[in-house]
Amino acid sequence: MAVQLVALCIDAHDPFRLARFWVGVLGWDLAEDHHGDGIALAPVDDTGFQLRFLPSEAEKVQQNRMHFDLTSVSPEMQEQTVARALKLGGRHHDVGQGPDATHVVLADPEGNEFCVIEAGNKFLAECGFVGALASDGSQDVGYFWSRALEWPLVWDQDQETAIRSPRGGPKITWGGPPFTPKTGRNRLRFDLAAEGDVNAELDRLIGLGAARADSPPGPFGEVEMTDPDGNEFTVWP
């Protein structure tokens, strides 16, 4: 029994505008949002999960705890990705990376950070264009998600962890301490689909270290939970 990562949800003031930006950057396709309240993008590669842009009036108050690392096969590709993102409405963003950084830090039109990684990066060499979801988090939360998704650890050193689906796609990484304090609800969150009995799966996740949120189940029977670091995610039947 397990859960499947089916979507990364992104809160947006203007879901359609933000979806158009990411269509242009990633080359993904618009797709039906089966839950009806957002705009979905479907991957055209082995990423394995959709993006869901959900309407929200909440303001962004801090750096996101998760961001995309986009890969490059050549310096020219890195330059092209950056230029395309800027033309679509992105901007350069300073997170303290310094002038010698070989990756480029950008933000989308609503301020969500992402990186365009330099060519020759060995850690992401086997990954596609979406190389990683790079996250702020503990070693324990990396272990939790490895067990929850049944994805193997592909990195576990100096309190940094990374997992990757056996079917390929991006890595999900957690950088270890120091941690950025969590303020409010995360703008980026996972949607999981239960394979089999949803209540049994909820119990399994709780046994691994998750907790149920205080809110009641949603209209489709979905249940919001938090991982050991307090990050919200939703389990759908």
Language-model segments: which ranges?
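Glyoxalase I/VOC metalloenzyme domain signal
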Residues: M1-H34, L41-D94, A107-D158, I163-P216, ...
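Short, small/polar residue-rich loop motifs at catalytic or cofactor-binding pockets
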Residues: P99-A101, G218-F220
